[in-house]
């Protein structure tokens, strides 16, 4: 009798543990990260564009939080994407510039660049915790795409992937370079953002119903070569100065429609109640006619200085919208938030919300913003730092610390531009001196017009010392090929 009672007690305890674990799993959020490509800070209606209509994103912002000071991990695509997925500066991962397709060896070893297998991503952690995981859209984290020489999306936790190495080709219209789980998808009719939305919706319909999910939607729009549906272009001909500009306006609008279709599918599948949605861009807008296929790149930086490939604000300050139905505090719904956040924050935030502990030895550059999503202030102890050795402007180094923006040249601007760091060039960047310090008060000078470095000497000394520490910390941990 005593043994029977002990058995029953043990059974009750075991059942309680299982129920508790299942309840915990049920409470974990689904996560959808939506990433645009070269979207300007001023390209959305809710960020002030005078012509482009983005009703879906307007609603996401109205029912969520719109951030004014959201940053990408880099002012260019590949390093930005690596930073978003890993929560680490792309310099630590050894991705310094956009990654070309590895057609032949080049002297600076750029053909070798890829996100190395040792890197752990959001998808890696979530897949290990029982999440269903999916990538649809642009990958751009390796040079040997869909080849055995380098790791592919499934190596980094994506159990289903439908992607391109870089841009949709030959344009957004009827792309023919998508790969689905290692097999060429062939020619596809339609426009890239809608093709990506189709795949995302189909995956949501087919995935295991009892698993939470992580869906990474990486649109190609509005990166060149821009192509948009004629009927949407026609809607913007009166607002645009040229047909090419109308093409760009329609490109952003078509992306908004694609987001709307995915949102409707979440509602139809009863997945909207506990899905955290994060919308942002990989970097700022492309400069019109910087090269031939940028003839339709009419992206707007809004009030910010510079464009893509710059270390001034427009290079990496981007749209940032977070929506989490029934989970954000009511006081935050529909607010415009001035807290500094970064795409580097996604991994620690999402993992915390999924009740995952990260390895102590993992050197993260992002900060969990979970407390912010709960209605509290965010204490960001570590400043944001960018080192882009191929920047169009001469300041290769930038830092955001509290309200302050710091820019610096390397060796007075004499350090050669670099698209990759090799064992030969690594000593150059490690020994380089930060010079020509500029400081801007972004609270009062969003456009970076008034350099106060020579006005406030005490502040300049403090921020310069901080920048030097952060620079050395990063370059000493930067990977060389």
Predicted regions and their residues:
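Bacterial N-terminal signal peptides that target proteins for export
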Residues: 1-11
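Bacterial N-terminal signal peptides
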Residues: 9-19
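Formylglycine-dependent sulfatase
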Residues: 21-438, 446-481
């Amino acid at each position: 009798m005593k043994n029977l009672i002990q058995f029953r007690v043990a059974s009750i305890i075991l059942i309680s543990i299982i129920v508790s674990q299942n309840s915990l799993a049920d409470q974990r959020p689904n996560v959808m990260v939506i990433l645009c490509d070269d979207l300007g800070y001023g390209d959305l209606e809710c960020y002030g564009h005078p012509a482009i209509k983005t009703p879906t994103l307007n609603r996401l912002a109205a029912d969520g939080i719109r951030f004014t000071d959201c940053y990408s991990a880099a002012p260019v695509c590949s390093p930005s994407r690596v930073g978003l997925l890993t929560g680490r500066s792309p310099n630590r991962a050894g991705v310094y510039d956009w990654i070309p397709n590895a057609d032949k060896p080049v002297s600076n070893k750029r053909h070798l660049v890829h996100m190395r297998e040792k890197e752990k991503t959001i998808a890696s952690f979530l897949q290990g915790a029982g999440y269903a995981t999916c990538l649809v859209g642009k990958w751009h984290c390796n040079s040997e795409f869909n080849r055995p020489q380098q790791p592919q999306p499934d190596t980094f936790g994506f159990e289903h992937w439908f992607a391109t190495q870089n841009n949709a080709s030959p344009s957004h219209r009827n792309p023919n370079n998508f790969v689905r789980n290692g097999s060429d998808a062939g020619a596809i009719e339609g426009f890239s953002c809608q093709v990506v939305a189709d795949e995302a919706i189909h995956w949501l319909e087919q995935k295991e119903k009892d698993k939470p999910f992580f869906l990474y939607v990486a649109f190609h729009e509005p990166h060149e070569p821009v192509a948009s549906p004629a009927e949407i272009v026609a809607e913007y001909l009166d607002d645009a100065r040229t047909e090419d500009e109308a093409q760009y306006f329609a490109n952003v609008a078509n992306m908004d429609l694609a987001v709307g279709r995915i949102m409707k599918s979440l509602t139809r599948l009863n997945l909207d109640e506990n899905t955290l949605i994060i919308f942002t861009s990989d970097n700022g807008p492309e400069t019109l006619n910087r090269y031939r296929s940028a003839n339709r790149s009419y992206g707007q930086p809004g009030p910010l200085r510079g464009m893509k490939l710059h270390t001034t604000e427009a290079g990496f300050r981007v749209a940032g919208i977070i929506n989490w139905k029934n989970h954000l505090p009511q006081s935050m719904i529909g607010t415009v938030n001035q807290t500094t956040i970064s795409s580097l924050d996604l991994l620690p935030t999402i993992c915390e919300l999924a009740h995952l502990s990260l390895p102590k030895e993992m050197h993260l550059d992002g900060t969990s913003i979970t407390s912010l999503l709960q209605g509290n202030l965010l204490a960001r102890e570590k400043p944001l730092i960018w080192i882009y050795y191929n920047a169009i402007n001469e300041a290769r180094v930038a830092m955001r610390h509290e309200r302050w923006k710091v820019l610096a040249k390397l060796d007075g601007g004499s350090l050669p531009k670099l698209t990759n760091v090799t064992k030969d060039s690594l000593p150059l960047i490690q020994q380089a001196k930060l010079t020509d310090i500029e400081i801007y008060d972004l609270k009062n000078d969003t456009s970076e017009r008034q350099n106060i470095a020579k006005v406030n000497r005490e502040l300049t000394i403090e921020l310069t010392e901080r920048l030097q520490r952060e620079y050395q910390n990063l370059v000493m941990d930067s990977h060389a090929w």
